[in-house]
């Protein structure tokens, strides 16, 4: 199977240097489960000063990323059979676990468009299939959001995580948050491991963990709890 291809268009490609070197994600790159390719729009600038930004039409603060070098960098990227182009933007849809699952399963290539400066020329949006946000805040560029998505997608690819079962019950895999975990010692500074986890009763452990997931979600993320409840108890159609 060909490696999952990740192409990043960024003015700060050096920011991605640690990705292939760290943890299970680094090992996935080393094992050719995924490949990372970096493309700098500055390498495609058309003037001798390699200019990639300019002042905004209509005036205003800051500089705007020019379309020409970004389009040229984008058009230099090889196209795989199942490609998805993601624009990192605070105006995009908030990232969800279901998005990471969809991208890891339905595609074999992701292309990331990372903005900088005050923003990017509006015409750059035409390149994207989706716009993705990390939340209701603004960063200096799209590199950190892109790295977050790369981490989240690569860890879901077959062969990355040694125990695939560990991905099944983790937080957000089915809208519920993950249950609590304990390891030795059984008693630490008066904080003890629940008896059920030491009982050897696998059915009781599974029930306790599910109850923990529901309780945590209800307390910490009522928005997710309400969505989960709606799925479990759908409203019947009106007669």
Swiss-Prot record:
Residue ranges with Basic and acidic residues bias: 211-224
InterPro entries in the cross-refs: Alpha/beta_knot_MTases, tRNA_m1G_MeTrfase_C_sf, tRNA_m1G_MeTrfase_TrmD, tRNA_m1G_MTases_N, tRNA_MeTrfase_TRMD/TRM10
E.C. designation(s): 2.1.1.228
Alphabetically ordered keywords of this record: Cytoplasm, Methyltransferase, S-adenosyl-L-methionine, Transferase, tRNA processing
Residues reported in the UniProt entry to bind S-adenosyl-L-methionine: 115, 134-139
HAMAP family on file: TrmD
Family, per entry: Belongs to the RNA methyltransferase TrmD family.
Stated name of the protein: tRNA (guanine-N(1)-)-methyltransferase
Protein source organism: Synechococcus sp. (strain CC9311)
């Amino acid at each position: 199977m060909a490696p999952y291809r990740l192409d990043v268009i960024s003015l700060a490609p050096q920011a991605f240097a640690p990705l292939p070197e760290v943890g299970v994600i680094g090992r996935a790159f080393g094992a050719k489960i995924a490949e990372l390719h970096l493309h700098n729009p500055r390498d495609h600038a058309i003037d001798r000063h390699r200019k990639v930004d300019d002042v905004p039409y209509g005036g205003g603060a800051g500089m705007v990323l020019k379309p020409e070098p970004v389009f040229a960098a984008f058009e230099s990227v090889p196209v795989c059979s199942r490609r998805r182009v993601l624009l990192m933007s605070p105006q995009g849809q908030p990232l969800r676990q279901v998005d990471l699952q969809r991208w890891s399963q339905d595609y074999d290539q992701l292309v990331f468009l990372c903005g900088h400066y005050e923003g990017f020329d509006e015409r750059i949006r035409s390149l994207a299939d989706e716009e993705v946000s990390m939340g209701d805040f603004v960063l200096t560029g799209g590199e950190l959001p892109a790295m977050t998505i790369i981490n989240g997608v690569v860890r879901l690819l077959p062969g990355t995580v040694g125990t695939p079962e560990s991905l099944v019950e983790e937080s957000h895999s089915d809208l519920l948050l993950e249950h609590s975990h304990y390891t030795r010692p059984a008693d630490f500074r008066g904080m003890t491991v629940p008896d059920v986890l030491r009982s050897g009763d696998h059915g009781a452990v599974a029930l306790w963990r599910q109850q923990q997931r529901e309780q945590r979600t209800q307390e910490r993320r009522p928005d997710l709890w309400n969505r989960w409840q709606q799925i479990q108890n759908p409203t019947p159609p009106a007669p």
